Amino acid sequence: MPPLADASTETLSPAEQAAVRHPEKAHRPDQPIARKPDWIRVKAPGSPEWVETQKIVKEHKLVTVCEEAGCPNIGECWAKKHATFMIMGDTCTRACAFCNVKTGLPNGLDPHEPAHIADAVQKLGLSHVVITSVDRDDLADGGAEHFAQVIRAIREASPKTTIEVLTPDFLRKDGALEIVVAARPDVFNHNLETVPAKYLSVRPGARYFHSIRLLQRVKELDPTIFTKSGIMVGLGETRNEVLQLMDDLRTADVDFLTIGQYLQPTRKHHAVEAFITPDEFAAYAEVANAKGFLLVSASPLTRSSHHAGEDFARLKAARLERLGR
């Protein structure tokens, strides 16, 4: 019997750790982990700036998606003192086949978390911050009010910091989206993750067209907020399916599209069906730009929050250019 979900995993094998973090995947047959191609290589973290970022995160008892999702860009981002904070705990109520975040029954919300996040943003001197969360289907509003509290706390502590939220879908949470939008983040990101044909096997707890409508509704509520969405490729999707997804996002007036390579966290997760080449990513970016997105980022190591601050500046410039200013 595997240890309980809150037990220490330091002495466990990789397979045992996976069972602790992902008990809902224990029944899945092991999937082979393919060798990464030469174009997917990152430097190991360990710079003084990386260590300082890690220290601030730990001192404030914060959770980052950089760590929980096993992001390959953590060394680069933390060296620049960039971190994506994951609020409302480290335990998700869903069990997506691609995701390395722990699944289970989450704890209650920490009322001090907004202040802790705001203090960390101030100490890191962030000009742009990304706030994401686990899915909290157990909460009546899906955690929307907590998102709003975090946004307001950052605004008070660090008024010049621009704020990007990467939210869950708030499925069956009436009024939740409106609460987050009313707090006026600068960027509202919600990832589609994959094409609709793959939802049942990759993202079974979500609904593709609900996510499209969520993004469209943000623009209806506040057209000044930039909207953003991201997908992974290499999950078995076809090129035509990706192009149709681009059209769906443009119909919802989404400003920014990110496309990155799916990387398999453990043998219990969805297998990598293909490694997309840099040239294929460049071709996707060319098509997406032609379809009218303000900004497109497509590469093997592209992730939703990678270079988010620089991308926000580019988004603002692209909007002004399109408006002829």
Curated annotation (Swiss-Prot):
Compartments, as annotated in UniProt: Cytoplasm
Pathway connected to this protein: Protein modification; protein lipoylation via endogenous pathway; protein N(6)-(lipoyl)lysine from octanoyl-[acyl-carrier-protein]: step 2/2
Record text on cofactor binding: Binds 2 [4Fe-4S] clusters per subunit. One cluster is coordinated with 3 cysteines and an exchangeable S-adenosyl-L-methionine.
Domain of life, per lineage: Bacteria
Positions of disulphide bridges: none
Alphabetic keyword roster: 4Fe-4S, Cytoplasm, Iron, Iron-sulfur, Metal-binding, S-adenosyl-L-methionine, Transferase
Cofactor(s) required, per the database record: [4Fe-4S] cluster
Keyword Iron-sulfur recorded: yes
Name under which the protein is recorded: Lipoyl synthase
Species this chain originates from: Beijerinckia indica subsp. indica (strain ATCC 9039 / DSM 1715 / NCIMB 8712)
